[in-house]
From Swiss-Prot:
Source organism phylogeny: Bacteria, Pseudomonadati, Pseudomonadota, Gammaproteobacteria, Moraxellales
Protein name: Acetyl-coenzyme A carboxylase carboxyl transferase subunit beta
ZnF C4-type: positions: 59-81
Entry GO CC: acetate CoA-transferase complex
Family named by the database record: Belongs to the AccD/PCCB family.
Region Disordered, annotated ranges: 1-28
Species in which this protein is naturally found: Psychrobacter cryohalolentis (strain ATCC BAA-1226 / DSM 17306 / VKM B-2378 / K5)
Subunit comment: Acetyl-CoA carboxylase is a heterohexamer composed of biotin carboxyl carrier protein (AccB), biotin carboxylase (AccC) and two subunits each of ACCase subunit alpha (AccA) and ACCase subunit beta (AccD).
Gene: accD
Localisation per UniProt entry: Cytoplasm
Required co-factors: Zn(2+)
InterPro entries per the UniProt record, alphabetical: AcCoA_carboxyl_beta, Acetyl_CoA_COase_Trfase_b_su, ClpP/crotonase-like_dom_sf, COA_CT_N
Amino acid sequence: MANNMTDTMTKPDINNDSTSLQQNGNKAGQSWFERPIPGIKQQLTAQLTAVETEPSTKCSSCHSIITNTALIFNCYVCPHCDHHLPMSARERLNWLLDQVEGELGQEFTAKDPLKFVDSKPYPSRMAEAQEKTKESEALIVLYGKLRNLDIVTCAFDFRFMGGSMGSVVGDRFVQAAEKALADRVPLVCFAASGGARMQEGLLSLMQMARTAAAIERLRIAGVPYIVVLTNPVYGGVTASLAMLGDIHLAEPKAMIGFAGKRVIEQTVRETLEEPFQRAEFLLEHGVVDEVVHRHQMIDTIYRLLAKLCSVPNVDVQ
């Protein structure tokens, strides 16, 4: 009986089966555990195509590619390395204000009294900047509400000729200060500039004195003025309106100074190591009051203004 059972049962041929598996698995040159799940290639291709077609931005710090939708949702902060990317002036002000009630200074237009020409005429540079930014000048001024507070706020757009300060920027800032003074509401300025606009010569340098005088009138009247230093702030803007606030906030790692780092190194003949001229360096040396992450900036500004304006029941810690 045992012999019959042995005869009728067939022992598995291990060699033949393994050969068969190997042959089946290698139809596409892969072993069985390397074969892709059916349909996954099509899914990945569709996802990659969607990413490639959606407008994206490369982080200047970690070089990650971020979709513009994700970047806007995250307030232009890189989700991978927390680097603060630039924001346009209008985006920044609309982000700050809960309700925009109006805009100031649109009637001012730049003139070219010097007929200044460098590699191209000044009017041509202005036209290019206006086309690039869809703005008429480097400073935008809005007024409205930050929660329950009426405020006037302005922001530099670094994309517009490096956020340089010319006569129109000075006119708009002075008008913002006068509006804040007349309504007795706080003024908040987001600074991002390379300095005075060389194409306007002495007219641009004169704006340093004009803006400083306007800020002094606010100080005498007891109207709060807060400056937020973003990346970068240099030159005549640093030497005037950007350093005359009642409170100075700065975004992380923002470059802030008068002359550039390389200019200083050539003058003193020394190598200046990081974090020289960074916001954190200035905080350590008492130049700025606080370095604030962009995600906490609105809450911080509101708490400070609420304290300065004596708004009750606000935690200012």
